[in-house]
């Protein structure tokens, strides 16, 4: 957890696979603008608890963590900002608990759409079968691939693979894995 400043509370939710450290450049500027800024590590990252049950990582759980954090900080309300996977947490926090989260901003992920199905179903129904979300659904497969060479995994996830098309990293070639 990183914290700086005094004033109304602003929570900064990092994305995947990042930590609160990702906000280190924004925290001083927001604090200097008159806010109390807190950037937590999200559930399962950094020094947080990491439940073994994948069912413990839902948006409801993550929103609950943010609500509990606001209360633990002695506050009743906060502005919530999320980047990447932190953005859906921020958007849903504001939707589910507008009494706590009075303002919301999402970076790189738009507000949740009201589609006809769940996101994974929508991808499949639109003929998309190789998005990284889908690859991560088979228990143990991505984990085994990532654990074979942790340094290479982090280099690729955080630094890219040199694709000329920046969106190419989101797709998995059949039989070749994510990396």
Regions found by a protein language model. Give the residues of each.
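Conserved HGGG/HGGXW glycine-rich cap/lid loop of the alpha/beta-hydrolase fold
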Residues: 2-49, 69, 83
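Flexible "cap/lid" subdomain of the alpha/beta-hydrolase fold that forms the substrate-access gate
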Residues: 45-81, 85-179
């Amino acid at each position: 957890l990183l914290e700086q400043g005094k004033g109304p509370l602003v929570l900064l939710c990092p994305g995947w696979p990042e930590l609160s450290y990702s906000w280190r450049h924004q925290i001083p500027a927001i604090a200097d603008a008159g806010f109390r800024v807190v950037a937590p590590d999200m559930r399962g990252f950094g020094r947080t608890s990491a439940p073994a049950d994948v069912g413990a990582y839902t948006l409801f759980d993550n929103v609950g963590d943010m609500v509990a954090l606001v209360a633990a900080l002695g506050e009743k309300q906060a502005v919530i900002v999320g980047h990447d996977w932190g953005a859906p947490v921020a958007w849903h926090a504001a939707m589910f608990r507008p009494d706590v989260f009075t303002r919301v901003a999402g970076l790189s992920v738009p507000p949740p759409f009201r589609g006809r199905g769940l996101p994974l179903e929508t991808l499949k129904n639109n003929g998309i079968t190789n998005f990284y979300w889908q690859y991560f659904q088979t228990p143990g497969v991505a984990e085994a691939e990532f654990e074979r060479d942790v340094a290479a995994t982090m280099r690729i996830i955080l630094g890219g693979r040199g694709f000329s098309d920046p969106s190419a990293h989101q797709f998995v070639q059949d039989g070749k894995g994510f990396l």
